Amino acid sequence: MSRKARDPIVLPQGVEVSLQNNEIVVKGPKGSLTQTLAPEVVVEIKDKEVFVSPAPNVVDRPSRVQGLFWALISNMVQGVSAGFEKRLEMIGVGFRAAVQGSVLDLSIGVSHPTKIPIPADIQVTVEKNTLISVKGINKQLVGEFAANIRAKRRPEPYKGKGIRYENEYVRRKAGKAAKTGKK
């Protein structure tokens, strides 16, 4: 049994959870999310608390799936109540970003502007041309979109130029030593 899944998920004010067929639906002030449940878990809703337990007939892999669905439901509850945000910073001469409609336009030191379509459930804002904020209620979509932006120009280890998460540590390497000595 998963250690985290032993504890119930406490629902904050304004968040409702319901079971429909084989799906769990979480509704809150920021929107609603749906997740299909695996047959290895049983979800019970009692008094503003959600309990995730293994199905009685499953012996194969109950604790892993139980912990997974506990985390998924917990993230859904947090997403519809508070939301998620990932912040990225661009470091480099001439690096800048802009949002044009539903497209994120990046100038990242290549010969052409890089355009990334923004998914419908994600809000992207650009501050000071080099700070990108990705917000949404689905933790997986927010993280995946932020990772796709970062993958366009990862921070390089010599000068640190590139796109990185805010407060991300980039391990630096020493460059080539200057040649000194005999001719």
UniProtKB/Swiss-Prot annotation:
Keywords, A to Z?
A: Ribonucleoprotein, Ribosomal protein, RNA-binding, rRNA-binding
Q: What role is this protein assigned?
A: This protein binds to the 23S rRNA, and is important in its secondary structure. It is located near the subunit interface in the base of the L7/L12 stalk, and near the tRNA binding site of the peptidyltransferase center.
Species of provenance? Chlamydia felis (strain Fe/C-56) (Chlamydophila felis)
UniProt name for this protein = Large ribosomal subunit protein uL6
**Got a GO cellular component term for this one?**
cytosolic large ribosomal subunit
Family note: Belongs to the universal ribosomal protein uL6 family.
**A single GO molecular function term of this UniProt record:** structural constituent of ribosome
Report the NCBIfam families cross-referenced here. Answer: L6_bact
Q: Would I find Manganese among this entry's keywords?
A: no
Q: Which gene encodes it?
A: rplF
Q: How would you summarize the oligomeric state and partners of this protein?
A: Part of the 50S ribosomal subunit.
Q: Which PROSITE patterns does the record associate with it?
A: RIBOSOMAL_L6_1
What GO terms in the biological process aspect are recorded for it? cytoplasmic translation
